[in-house]
Amino acid sequence: MLKLQEKLKNDYGLVFNDEDLLKTAFTHSSFTNEERLPKIANNERLEFLGDVALSLVISDYLYRTYPEKLEGELSKMRSSIVRTESLANFSRSCGFGEFLRLGHGEEKMGGRDRETTLENLFEAFLGALFIDQGMDEVRKFIQHVVIPHVKNDDYVKVIDYKTELQEVLQVGGETTITYNILKEEGPAHDRSFVAAVYNNGKELGRGLGKSKKVAEQKAAENAIKGQNHVS
């Protein structure tokens, strides 16, 4: 972790007070499984926290920066910024993958550059940063790494199928859209998910993805295209 600490200090002016917390953020579930460590020793709990922190900072930035945009437009922009591919690219730009502690099997299968793994790593780092130094430092880091891309409109045109489906259905009147994860397959470090989307209790489509977010987006996409099958 010493090299990681040096990188964070040199690139972002960050010095973690709790090195064990930083180590946890960079520990994949495949590593804890192989080393027979407790499940809470991997970065999944920090990922959960970082996801919320990221969403809040991005939402606040978009709200203040685009006073002319309606809620639906802001939701589309936020969704495109925090989608799997975007967060994986942010993680790559920070060079985080190099420092991730992976199990040998996951390493051999290319897990170090897997999109969902890098997405989760980026969120876990934000969660650790929040605990260690508070929301102000999380905001500064996001403004340094993420916001420049938002200013360039890099993510405005990315399709968010969940929001698009909601807009299509709302034209017909009152609607209640829900998503449900129907199936989880594969080992903990290489999960696949099948999601279904419903409108007022009626199933509209299903989707397959390497994360719950991706599966739900695929289900919404298939619903829009009228394809009620898994793909």
UniProtKB/Swiss-Prot annotation:
Start and end residues of each DRBM domain: 160-229
Gene Ontology BP annotations: mRNA processing; regulation of gene expression; rRNA processing; tRNA processing
Keyword annotations: Cytoplasm, Endonuclease, Hydrolase, Magnesium, Metal-binding, mRNA processing, Nuclease, RNA-binding, rRNA processing, rRNA-binding, tRNA processing
Top-level lineage group: Bacteria
Cofactor(s) required, per the database record: Mg(2+)
Annotated family: Belongs to the ribonuclease III family.
Role of this protein: Digests double-stranded RNA. Involved in the processing of primary rRNA transcript to yield the immediate precursors to the large and small rRNAs (23S and 16S). Processes some mRNAs, and tRNAs when they are encoded in the rRNA operon. Processes pre-crRNA and tracrRNA of type II CRISPR loci if present in the organism.
Protein name: Ribonuclease 3
Lineage, opening ranks: Bacteria, Bacillati, Bacillota, Bacilli, Lactobacillales
